[in-house]
Every structure is written in structure tokens, then in C-alpha cells.
């Protein structure tokens, strides 16, 4: 179930900062992503790219649920790569990076927008690679993860000029 609603960018930033202040110890790394990072004036939800702390994902999931419940939020859904919470009336999506060598892809995937993500997928296919929310992969068997520490790494590997988040999805702006 989606809890998306329209809110002003400034209000979304305040909610995101508050959420992060109360949950940041759950992550090794985190980045405010999505439409907030792209500086969209109207935001429908809050997206965060995160590397969960700890080796045991099930234990992390339990700890995250308790924390969010404890700060007045609630779990909307847990998935393999995206977890959603409802917090202060807004949907907060965590894009989970379960391998730090895929951090660059997770940042790009979480920041979007959808057209940018589709473009990455096309570029990867043209280069004989696979890209998804888990990382950038070779097509050999078994597939090998290609290390992407930054979004610029992803662009370099795909032969795609890096666009800052606020320019993504906007024609004629670079």
C-alpha cells in the first residue's frame, strides 16, 4: 500500500532530517535521495539510499522496525532491496545497499528519476552488462559485481556523462 502524498520540498527535507537523526545509527552509510535530492518543488515521498549496519539482515530488519515504531512510525513493507515506512504522514523508502561495492548504483537508483534509471538500464545492456537495484553486473556465469563506489563510477563504466541529481529528467539542462 502506498502512502504517498504531495508535500513541499522544504517540509520533506525537515521530515527526512528528523527521520535520519533518529535512525542514522542503523546505517553504515546513508544519502538523502529521490525527488528531495533532485530538488523537486513538490515531493511525493522521501527516498534514502542506505547501507544497513551489521551482517545479519534479519536482525537489522527487526531492529529497524522497533526503532521506527518507537519514534512514532510504522512499517509499510519490507522487501529485498526497498523497505518502506510511514513516518509523520509521509512514506519513507529505504533503498538498501547490501554490498558496499554497489553503493554508486544504489545512489543512482534511489535518486532516479524513473527515466534516468531506464536510461541506465539501456546503457548497461548496450555494453553487455546488467544493472538493477542490487548493482552493476557482468553477463558471464556466474555474474560478477562491478564495483561502483560513486555515481560517477557508474557513468564512467556505462559511457554516460554524469548528470547532477537536480538536472536529471530535465531536458536541455546538464
Locate predicted features:
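Charged, flexible boundary elements
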Residues: 7-21
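Acidic, metal-coordinating catalytic segment for phosphate/diphosphate chemistry
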Residues: 3-11, 56-174
Amino acid at each position: 500500500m502506498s502512502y504517498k502524498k504531495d508535500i513541499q520540498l522544504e517540509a520533506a527535507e525537515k521530515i527526512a532530517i528528523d527521520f535520519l537523526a533518529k535512525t542514522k545509527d542503523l546505517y553504515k552509510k546513508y544519502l538523502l535521495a529521490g525527488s528531495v535530492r533532485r530538488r523537486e518543488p513538490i515531493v511525493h515521498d522521501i527516498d534514502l539510499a542506505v547501507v544497513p549496519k551489521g551482517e545479519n539482515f534479519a536482525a537489522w530488519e527487526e531492529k529497524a522496525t522497533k526503532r521506527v515504531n518507537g519514534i512514532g512510525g510504522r512499517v509499510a513493507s519490507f522487501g529485498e532491496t526497498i523497505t518502506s515506512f510511514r513516518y509523520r504522514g509521509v512514506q519513507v523508502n529505504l533503498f538498501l545497499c547490501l554490498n558496499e561495492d554497489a553503493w554508486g548504483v544504489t545512489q543512482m537508483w534511489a535518486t532516479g528519476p524513473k527515466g534516468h534509471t531506464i536510461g541506465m538500464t539501456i546503457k548497461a545492456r548496450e555494453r553487455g552488462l546488467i544493472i538493477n537495484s542490487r548493482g552493476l553486473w557482468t553477463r558471464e556465469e556466474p555474474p560478477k559485481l562491478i564495483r561502483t563506489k560513486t555515481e560517477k563510477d557508474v557513468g564512467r563504466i556505462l559511457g554516460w556523462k554524469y548528470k547532477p541529481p537536480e538536472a536529471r529528467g530535465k531536458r536541455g539542462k546538464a
